[in-house]
Amino acid sequence: MIEKTKQFFVDLFWKLVLLAVVYGVRTYLLVFYRPKMTFLGNTVKSTALKQPMVIIANHTSMLDPLMVQALFFHNRSIVVAKDQIEDPHFSWALKRFKNVIPCDRFNLDTEWALIAKKELEKGNSVIIFPEGKCRYDGLLNEFKTGFAFLARSTGAPVLSLGIDGIYKIGHRTQIMVDEPETIERVKGIPSSKHLAERSEYFRQKVWELKQRALGQMGAILPVSAETPEEIIAEENK
């Protein structure tokens, strides 16, 4: 009985801590960076989505996942790299959040897709950053095909976001939101090839949205195979 009572108060303590963290971070992001969302389509006009979707975005800053979750605050889960979840700096929180879907980005992992599918079936949108990591030189990394596989296998629309990635006090972080699109199977095209083509299509789409968010139109993004690897300074490795 004593142990159960003790565990109850421990669980309650962590729930209160996590609530404070979630609402504290959200308030900070919304107040100091004052995000401005521009909805370009006719289907989605607010973050109150009428159906669960696969939400994708470019990954320019470590704050991007927090910002997207702060904006799409209700009925959403997010795919997070397993190594980030196991990092002692973040594990105390990430392992306790029920909306976090772990994904092994270094090995073949299909379990995350099964969990994500269940989340969509429950009515929760799934946030994915297809690049898998931040890129700081202005380009986009290759989009992994997992999001396309999830969208195609479940029928959930893909909602593309373009984030300017600028988080400075005095600057309003710009987010462009496009019309959602579905990914359907195409007869005669191998599954892997089709997913790769769709992933590149959405990569280019997110790139254009990001450029619009930055107010820079006309810049061309090379296809994944021709995009050079990012050169990372030694002190940042």
Feature map (PLM): residue ranges:
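A generic structural signal for well-ordered alpha-helical segments
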Residues: 30, 72, 94-95, 119, ...
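Catalytic core of membrane glycerolipid acyltransferases/transacylases, capturing the structured
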Residues: 47-107
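Non-catalytic C-terminal accessory region of glycerolipid acyltransferases
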Residues: 2-5, 9-12, 16, 111-237
